[in-house]
Design a protein with these regions (language model features):
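Sequence/fold signature of self-assembling virion shell proteins
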Residues: 10-12, 79, 119-189
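Short, flexible loop/turn elements at secondary-structure junctions
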Residues: 15, 23, 111-113
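Short helix/loop capping segments that flank catalytic or ligand/cofactor-binding pockets
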Residues: 20, 29-30, 116-119, 163
Length: 189
């Protein structure tokens, strides 16, 4: 026999995010409303965006801070139908020449440029396919574009910024947002 008593709790995270857990019947939820599940959903729906933003920004910051590579490894060109494939292929060749490694690269491309690749796919000698499932470091990504042998993951532009601000989380404001004078990152390899 299961007996339930109810006490209301408010779960708050370190990002100024609060969840209100309403009274539920275990028969309806199957005991699924637990702190673990609420935290997992927060991580899946909100925290992953912040982690992506921070990681991409940190990689950009490291490349931009390297005087030997910041002019060759960071591309500021806007991707269009006419230059998208050549820009990504050129950056891949630069990185391969520099690292002397031929495999293991992944391109992160702003989702707003996906149309440029779709439009350019027909008129090129490159092998471009969309909708692939690719395993990268043990994580399977769906809807990946393959440009020859390079997996290209389309990422929301909001996660690809040159400047970020980590908010305090003291009030309702929390998380990571684009910083003042932030520019868009079109692609990262």
């Amino acid at each position: 026999t299961v007996t339930n008593s109810w006490k209301s709790y408010t779960l708050s995270m370190d990002r100024g995010v609060k969840f209100s857990l309403d009274r539920t019947d275990p028969n309806d939820t199957g005991f699924l409303v637990t702190a673990e599940n609420v935290i997992r959903e927060f991580a899946r729906n909100a925290l992953v965006k912040e982690q992506d933003t921070y990681r991409i920004h940190r990689l950009y910051e490291l490349a931009n801070g390297d005087a030997a590579h910041n002019t060759t490894h960071i591309i500021s060109a806007a991707l269009t139908k006419t230059n998208a494939i050549a820009t990504v292929s050129g950056l891949l060749q630069t990185v391969r020449d520099d690292a002397e490694e031929m495999d293991g690269y992944v391109a992160l491309i702003s989702h707003k440029h996906k149309t440029a690749f779709l439009e350019a796919a027909n008129g090129t000698y490159h092998d471009i396919s969309f909708g692939n499932a690719v395993s990268i470091n043990g994580v399977t990504y769906e809807n990946v574009m393959m440009l020859d042998d390079l997996p290209c993951v389309f990422v929301p532009q909001s996660r690809m910024k040159t400047v970020i601000t980590v908010q305090s989380g003291d009030s309702d404001q929390g998380g990571i947002v684009a910083g003042e004078n932030a520019k868009d990152i079109a692609e990262y390899l």
